[in-house]
Amino acid sequence: MVKLSIVLTPQFLSHDQGQLTKELQQHVKSVTCPCEYLRKVINTLADHHHRGTDFGGSPWLHIIIAFPTSYKVVITLWIVYLWVSLLKTIFWSRNGHDGSTDVQQRAWRSNRRRQEGLRSICMHTKKRVSSFRGNKIGLKDVITLRRHVETKVRAKIRKRKVTTKINRHDKINGKRKTARKQKMFQRAQELRRRAEDYHKCKIPPSARKALCNWVRMAAAEHRHSSGLPYWPYLTAETLKNRMGHQPPPPTQQHCITDNSLSLKTPLECLLTPLPPSADDNLKTPPECLLTPLPPSADDNLKTPPECLLTPLPPSAPPSAPPSADDNLKTRAECLLHPLPPSADDNLKTPSERQLTPLPPSAPPSADDNIKTTAERLRGPLPPSADDNLKTPSERQLTPLPPSAPPSADDNIKTPAEHLRGPLPPSADDNLKTPSERQLTPLPPSAPPSADDNIKTPAERLRGPLPPSADDNLKTPSERQLTPLPPSAPPSADDNIKTPAEHLRGPLPPSADDNLKTPSERQLTPLPPSAPPSADDNIKTTAEHLRGPLPPSADDNLKTPSERQLTPLPPSAPPSADDNIKTPAEHLQFRFHPQRMIISRDLPSVSSLPFHPQLHPQQMIISRYLLSICGFRFHRQRMIISRHLPSVSSLPFHPQLHPQQMIISRHLPSVCGGRFHPQPMIISRHLPSVSSLPFHPQLHPQQMIISRHLPSVCGGRFHPQPMIISRHLPSVSSLPFHPQLHPQQMIISRHLPSVCGGRFHPQPMIISRHLPSVSSLPFHPQLHPQQMIISRHLPSVCGGRFHPQPMIISRHLPSVSSLPFHPQLHPQQMIISRHLPSVCGGRFHPQPMIISRHLPSVSSLPFHPQLHPQQMIISRHLPSVCGERLWVPLPPSADDNLKTPSKRQLTPLPPSAPPSADDNIKTPAERLRGPLPPSADDNLKTPSKRQLTPLPPSAPPSADDNIKTPAERLRGPLPPSADDNLKTPSERQLTPLPPSAPPSADDNIKTPAERLRGPLPPSADDNLKTPSERQLTPLPPSAPTSADDNIKTPAERLRGPLPPSADDNLKTPPLATQEAEAEKPRKPKRQRAAEMEPPPEPKRRRVGDVEPSRKPKRRRAADVEPSSPEPKRRRVGDVEPSRKPKRRRAADVEPSSPEPKRRRLS
């Protein structure tokens, strides 16, 4: 037996029948009572639709569901309370209300005892709303005050339509008041003010805050009252005070108040007509917000987990046998089963990534080869669950037993040792999704041959797993790279092993060297000598990768099929190259509006950030890159070729178009990369690919992890395809920010490290032999720009570039820490030769060119919302970091800031005797002739940067060794800059066969001499025309040996120049003054650095001292009658007479004292 007791108030009964029915159904929906009985009760409410008494100040609805036994006491108490309230109301209402002044005073005295707040009646709601929570006015007081006013004014006020203003009571219905009306209103106003003043003093300070909060909550409830919600956890007092504030806001903001309401009190009347805003959600209690709103994803977030998980039906019984994975899998089913199968489910459901490992086979043969590598990668890291943040079980890579015959497998194993040995295996690689990495390797095949080492793991991982796309996320079939059988002779493996030695041998085993300054790692193998040794094996591989691909950039950029670099047919004896060749065919896949190619033997590619809302750009990373890290890529394609030990931390921000990422074979680790709405393909023999989280509310994406990938987790990839080829030791931290236009990035061969670089809307090209290119951040909302880094750059890190083209020529060990401050006019920055350090400088919209032989150029940040600019750093700069010390440039900061054209210091013609200068002179002529010296051409037209090499000299000496690779790179590709910037196919520089006599070492060392020696000290050559930077070296003189060529430049750059970044960072004029004051010291430094005293003074004389060459440089730089600009700069660097000229050029205004001040500072 169920009893239903309902106490109705006038405020509640003031609603219409439909609203009452809705409200009662909400309150009684949890009660199990007959529907017909409830309907009868609701239908009878219309009879009570009248304005009655206040029931003793208790205006709210009591709905009591009482059961026969345990609730009799409660029912009795409520009945007693109801009758007492009714009797009190009846007696008080019959206590003579004659409207006299004594009755009014008695009413206010009663208010002193019982009333702690005021009530107001809004014009649009016709309801009384308490000013603050818990304070009530007695019925006697209300009726006394109301009747007193109504008896005086009822005849004159029609239907309570009062248009009086709150602060001015001078009009009623648009008419002037009479003396009698004015007197009546003054009496009523005086009564209101007396009550207000009294209650202001009555309310203690501690209660005033609660009063204000209640007024705000009441106003918010009044605005959001679309229906009385069901509040199961609210107390009676709370529900009572929140009833009845539900009508929609009125069109007018006027409010009529009782005589008991003051003029300053009605905050509710002010807030009521306001439209519902986000502030209401913030200020309103969570119960009022969430209940009336429809169930959405926000309700799931804000509702406690018990409410979400309890009503959901349990998941279906797991198909697989109960295991450790089932524990995680069941929870995912409980959460995702009631939800619709959307793209968000794929993002948030780790069940798909949980690759349950297959049981290993009995004979432990070739798997031992992979096992050893896994141990090297995973051994130093602790097996704690924290390392494998979310699913460590999957990351537990149980190593396979090594294969018996150490043949071609050793070729892969050795590079892993070189790459992973010196670097510590950090737990960050397995950070967020260890479950996917827990790919327990399958048992090796019976015959432990060299082929089994590569093939058998693939069979173990792919054999037991179904070939469906769901297993490999969405398109596994494409990434299933079935390796070809290796050749019988294990000599080709030594060929791969030797490059690893070249890269790792001279460089320290420190992980930091690989991350930020891998230039030392950059030991790219030289072409082999006449007898075919291990170098020939590398050369053949390059032919396989570069030969079969078309030279069209569009094919590699937008057509993934073209990226599938189908290897050339192997030579007659099937060596280990055949094994690599097959994966190259499998590497080509789809990529969104951009593409990144990283070629073979790249130990690390990590941390490549790209900021959003930028124009398209390209990035290509070619062979022999030890490390590429810290780069973020938005909508671009990234291809990483063979021999990359690790690819990790590739985050991509959400809400981007689909993209693809392909990682080819023999990648020991690919971790920390987040991939959003794109397919990701990781090929065989990847020990770890981890931390690939997916953000919610994004479009569907695909992720494919091919065979033998222990783990792929924590990588974010937005709308771009990424391909990583074989034997890449590390490719990590490649975040991509959302809402950006397509872009491309190309990094050419032999780059030991490219890390931490952010690229905005520009194409970036990094050529061969760059040990490190890292930390190149680009801020968003900038115009398109281009960045080209030429050969032999040991390190390029930490540089932010805005909307400008950046060209870094050969043999630059490091370019770092060149910050640029925002909100500045366009300017240019030129760093000339022999600058020990230029770092920490802020540059806004200027062109900056970095030429050859710069040991370090790093941390070049550019602030957003700036016009396009260029950055040029000239040749032979040992270090450019953290300082503004400009030796060859004038000490005036204004010249570099606002007048970039003057900085284009076109080099003067060399002296009469054709010495090493002639070697520089010829490339400069070739570069200057076909390309215009306009900086705009470099910014928007990359074709100028495609410097087609000049024909070699007659005698094929060591120069031919350098010249031949240039022919291979430039010959098959068109000389247009667009091909290099946006067409990775052109970057596929297929090397020409080396000359017979010079040894492999001479091939690398001799170019260093040619690049170091023959380059002019003028920064103008590399300023605005990147084509000029493509300085194809002339054949060196006979006596100079190849070893001295490499060693001498390193000594000249590092020895005589101080590595202080502060000197070049903020005080370039000081550097200029010191250079001018210490003119004898500078030539001494050059002699110590170059080990050759005659060429150094010649360079300085040609660049700074000789006036005859300076006018010549002016003519070559501008190609226009703008000779005074180069004169100003050159004179600012060397001659005091030209310094005032520089001031004029910098400011374009007569502001010569400004550069003087800067020089003094």
Swiss-Prot record:
The record's subcellular location field reads: Membrane
What is the recorded membrane topology of this protein?
Single-pass membrane protein
| GO cellular component assignments | membrane
Q: Where is the composition biased (Pro residues)?
A: 311-321
Q: Which InterPro entries match?
A: NPB13-like_MII_rpt, NPIP, NPIP_N
Question: Transmembrane: present as a keyword of the record?
Answer: yes
In terms of superkingdom, the source organism counts as Eukaryota
Q: Into which family does the record put it?
A: Belongs to the NPIP family.
Q: What is this protein called?
A: Nuclear pore complex-interacting protein family member B11
- Organism this protein belongs to: Homo sapiens (Human)
